[in-house]
UniProtKB/Swiss-Prot annotation:
The gene is glmM. The lineage of its organism: Bacteria, Pseudomonadati, Pseudomonadota, Gammaproteobacteria, Moraxellales. It catalyses: alpha-D-glucosamine 1-phosphate = D-glucosamine 6-phosphate. The modification Phosphoserine is found at S102. Pfam families: PGM_PMM_I, PGM_PMM_II, PGM_PMM_III, PGM_PMM_IV. This is Phosphoglucosamine mutase. Its EC number is 5.4.2.10. PROSITE patterns: PGM_PMM. GO terms for biological process: carbohydrate metabolic process; peptidoglycan biosynthetic process; UDP-N-acetylglucosamine biosynthetic process. Catalyzes the conversion of glucosamine-6-phosphate to glucosamine-1-phosphate. Its cofactor is Mg(2+). The active site is at S102.
Amino acid sequence: MSYFGTDGIRGKFGEMPITPEFALKLGFAAGKVLKRTSPINKPIVVLGKDTRLSGYILESALQAGLNAAGVYVHLLGPLPTPAIAHLTRALHADAGIVISASHNPYFDNGIKFFSGEGKKLPDSLQDEINQELEHELHIEDTANLGKSVRLIDANGRYIEFCKSTFPYHFDLRNLTIVVDCANGAAYNVGPSVFRELGAKVIALYNDPNGMNINEHCGSTHPENLQKAVVHYKADLGIAFDGDADRVILVDKFGELVDGDHILYILATQAKKKPAGIVGTVMSNMALELALAKADVPFIRAKVGDRYVLQALEENDWVTGGEPSGHILTLDKSTTGDAIIAALQVLTVMVEQNKALHELVTGFELFPQVLVNVRLDQMMDPYSVPALVSEFEQAEAQLKGRGRLLIRKSGTEPVIRVMVEGDNQKEVTDLAHRLAESVRTHAA
């Protein structure tokens, strides 16, 4: 049985596999694999988390399992997921582990691994850990147990790293920035980075209590940030998600600037244009057309930063992302980093001496309607000839003006029907008609 999904192991705390007992076994299994594959006798693992209450319990269980397997653990405390990836590399650790469920509610949690290079763990190592989990936890030699130590200045190290990605001769002294920390992992380091670069920072949702992470705040709920930017007459707003690997921006008028806008800015407005951009099947068609006009190659990957990263590496490109705000800049970081992505946009604002809204003037997203069809039992819509015929008719109707995407959820019995085009009413009507057809044929 494989416990790993596309983004590690995730679920509701207290239910398998997100339990203290499983975390202990997982730590031991991962430790045994690292002992076999590490070039040193005492492998080192960097362990961090977000601000969920359950993170403390899972942290204790994981470190106990790792120590029992003979692994040394550096405890980082609450830090963004990309910070754990960076510190894994900086400390020359054998692996990094993040305890987080990203943008999910507080009662969920998850565990994911980074390789020593700060990248997602290879599938081959995940398979080895899965196999090791089938064995009983058995300590053979107490003389070879590992230890855990707390890294005293983990926050400071990561703050300095983020600042190093911003041009040394630039500063943010003339900007007022509202930062929504989602009561998550960036509650401390996020505002600090922008303050230390000279900005006047107004921090929101930076008081985590273990249960308020992502609660009506952060990149998935930016409404209050939009109001705050206008209220404080700020230059822009920055919203992170719970583990700060996603970012959504807000211009001074309170308008949202999502991942597609950010990729547009980095591809067309920066002094140095990227060799190409990787989006996903969810990236707006307007981005594809705008990049073609700017003569910047664009390809689509499957949904998920793992697939964006894979496509970037295959094409030897550095910039890619998703509309949700997962932005990768591989010349700066090995994984999606909300703070660094925001800094790259701020770099363009400073070098062009333009406000955020000016960088996206003339770039308008096509209307996009997503309808989630919840089913009693999952089915493949492309296995039903009548549905396939309807999909083909819709694609012919939208040809050159829009597109259709029908996909199954990877985590629940849901079919996602997405229609995009240049006419809002047409897109809305088509999405709901196709969704109803899927619902009818699934009954």
